[in-house]
Each structure stands twice: as structure tokens, then as C-alpha cells.
Amino acid sequence: HLTPVEIQLAIGLCEIFANQITLGEAEVQAQLVRDAKIKALQAQINPHFFFNAINTISAILRRDQEKARELLLQLSNYFRANLIGARETEITLGQERTQVDAYLELEQTRFPQKYNITFDQQVENDVYLPPFTIQVLVENALKHAFGARKDHNNVQITIKKLGARLVIQVADNGEGIALELLPKLGKEPLTSSKGSGNALYNLNQRLIGLYDERSALQITSSNKGTKIKISLPYHIKEGADNESLNR
């Protein structure tokens, strides 16, 4: 007989797969609307992350069923956020944080002690931004910044208001970006052995599509680390839902 935790795991997996089917349908519908290009760029799910997460949860399940259940809920949060992001061109910061926090918990469980992640959020959760904005920057840092280094890998995420602008910065203490690549990042598609070489380019294209010259992507790098900064118009919406996906 299945234990309650195993039943919950099966139910959660079914929900994830159902969400993926719904996401596919949402993408088809998105092609019929004016901003189809933007939504196509943002509705990207990394299959490697999904299978790595499932493997991590399966391994944890053998020794800590409650932790496995918590991770499964976070994986469900992650994919539910992808579903919302495929339908919307802007979401609240609270919704974005739910996905980022889910991603980070799964990655830090998979690689204990490898990453030190800190958030400095100086704005409320009801500010609006494009889906996956922070997620792309954080995932880019974890995948590309540190090479084979197994510890002392620091990532600082800063979110603040500067005048009428929302400024998001992700800084790491990694190996830095090759000088010949630095002018190209975010400006043109790049191939990558890790499968995410186009992430910054696609993000920048979405920002340009939404805000034109009112958005800015800035990248600075040295052998002591990299800083990627995004600047957007700061705005909230009247009566906006101030809660995350965990409500």
C-alpha cells in the first residue's frame, strides 16, 4: 500500500503534468493575440531542471518523506508560476519571488552548501514586472558563474526603487565573463553547452517588446564576479493582488 506521502507525491506529479498540458494549450492560444512573440519568449521551461528536481525528490523520499513532500510542493509552485507567466506579460513581484524561492530551494537541496543566496528586497510585493525577470538572472548566475567551484559561491539579489525606476541586480563572486562575450550578452543569441545561452537575449527582447527604450540591461564583469542590472518603469496596479502563489 502507498503511504500518505507517496500518495501526495503521485498527486503532485499528476498536477505538474496536467499543468504542462495546460501550458501547451495556453501557448497555442497565445499565438492568436497581439503579443504572441513576447509570450513565446517567456514560456520556456528547462526539461533538465524538471528531471533533476524529480531525481532529487526521489532521493530525499528514501530518508525524509516530509522534506520530499515540501520539495514537491515547491516544484508544483515553480510550474504553476510558469503557467501564469505564459499567460501574462506582467506579474507581481510576490508571484515572481514564489517561483524564484521554489527554484532556489530545489537547487540548494540538490547542491547542499554550494551556494550562498541573499536577497535585499527594498520594495513591496505589489510592484509589477515581466515574468521570469529575476528567475532568468538567478538561474544564469547559478549555471554559469562558478564553474566547478563547490563552495563559497555567493549570489546577491537586490530589488529597489530608484526614482521612477524598478532596479533589479544580481551579483555573483564567480569567475567572470570572457571579454569577447561581454559585448554580445543580451544583444544576440549565443550557444551554450548548458542550454541557456539565449536566456539573457530572450529576456532583453521581452523587455524591449514591453517597454522599448524605457528598459535597460547592463552587464559588468571581471575575474572577481559579474553584476547584471535591469531597470524598468516602476508601477503598481490599482487593486492588485499583493499575495504570492502560496496564498
Spans of features found by a protein language model:
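Short C-terminal beta-strand
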Residues: 226-235
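Two-component histidine phosphotransfer core
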Residues: 2-45, 49-219, 226-227
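Intrinsically disordered, low-complexity acidic/proline-/asparagine-rich linker or regulatory tail/stalk regions
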Residues: 241-247
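Short, charged low-complexity linker/loop segments at the C-terminal edge of domains
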Residues: 236-240
